[in-house]
Curated annotation (Swiss-Prot):
It catalyses: N(6)-carboxybiotinyl-L-lysyl-[protein] + acetyl-CoA = N(6)-biotinyl-L-lysyl-[protein] + malonyl-CoA. One of its GO terms (molecular function) is acetyl-CoA carboxylase activity. A zinc finger (C4-type) spans 27-49. This is Acetyl-coenzyme A carboxylase carboxyl transferase subunit beta. It comes from Chlorobaculum tepidum (strain ATCC 49652 / DSM 12025 / NBRC 103806 / TLS). The gene is accD. Pathway: Lipid metabolism; malonyl-CoA biosynthesis; malonyl-CoA from acetyl-CoA: step 1/1. Pfam families: Carboxyl_trans, Zn_ribbon_ACC. GO terms for biological process: fatty acid biosynthetic process; malonyl-CoA biosynthetic process. It is found in: Cytoplasm. The lineage of its organism: Bacteria, Pseudomonadati, Chlorobiota, Chlorobiia, Chlorobiales.
């Protein structure tokens, strides 16, 4: 027997399955719940605390180049397997599965376009592809970006976002440190500006090679920058590390980073800096 009856139907909340996946994200710093549109409007930075989410090269290209117009080059390069490396799965299988899952072909993309009305070359790394690790393809792409910069007599901007060298390629990966560094000297010989933008994280062989070789080394706020990770260092020296150790602000204080730029100011700041470097 029903004793009570609702005069007005209750509000029905959406089932979890009715809410599109990926619509909300949680800020890793302050814990705020952020809507996808809100993140897009703020270039994937938290409007509450300023935390910078990791983003892909194509997103950087879309807001750095004039009118979001850019043209990719050397997209066809693919990784080989010179060592026949196997960990939990063969290296070629790992690359294929990452490509299928991410929709990306490698951990680096190169593009040309206009920046402030002038030609520019941007090479962007992607942590979402095997940790942004540098293997032979990534090294070759950065080297070719330097070549394109020389060809166009245009400034080069490299956006680093990587855990370091790709262990699956062994010495072939480590060779890319010398290769990229040597190729970048051609820009200096011709007076072509090279700006290194370090984002979170810029570690290992990346920080030990081209990421620190810019005419200007700039960074996004609170980016982790270093060679070995803080936990490895702490466990090795058996001592606590200084507060903020290996963060962009710490490196700027000690002279390794020239300036720190919020993502919303990045395009304007790059145009201004390149204007001074002509």
């Amino acid at each position: 027997m029903v004793w009570f009856k609702r005069a007005i139907p209750s509000i029905r909340t959406k089932d979890k399955r009715d809410t599109p996946e990926g619509l909300w994200s949680k800020c890793d710093s302050c814990g705020a719940a952020l809507h996808k549109k809100q993140l897009e409007d703020h270039l994937y930075t938290c409007p509450h605390c300023g935390f910078h989410f990791r983003i892909s090269p194509d997103l950087y290209f879309s807001f750095l180049f004039d009118d979001g117009k850019w043209e990719e080059f050397d997209a066809q390069l693919r990784a080989a397997d010179p060592l026949k490396f196997v960990d939990t799965k063969p290296y070629p299988e790992r690359v294929r599965s990452t490509m299928q899952k991410s929709g990306k072909s490698e951990a680096c993309r190169n593009a040309t376009g206009k920046l402030g009305g002038s030609d520019a070359v941007i090479s962007g790394m992607d942590f979402g592809f095997i940790g942004g690790s540098m293997g032979s393809v990534v090294g070759e792409k950065i080297a070719r970006a330097a070549d394109k910069s020389v060809e166009l007599n245009a400034p080069l901007i490299v956006i680093s976002q990587s855990g370091g060298a790709r262990m699956m390629e062994g010495a072939f990966s480590l060779m890319q440190m010398a290769k990229t560094s040597a190729r970048l000297t051609r820009l200096g010989e011709r007076g072509i500006p090279f700006i290194s933008l370090m984002t979170d994280p810029t570690m290992g062989g990346i920080s030990a090679s081209f990421a620190m070789l810019g005419d200007l080394n700039i960074s996004e706020p609170k980016a982790l920058i270093g060679f070995a990770g803080p936990r490895v260092i702490r466990d090795t020296i058996k001592r606590d590390l200084p507060e903020g150790f290996q963060r962009a602000e710490f490196l700027q204080k000690h002279g390794f980073v020239d300036t720190i730029v919020h993502r919303k100011d990045l395009r304007a700041q790059l145009i201004k800096l390149l204007g001074h470097m002509k």
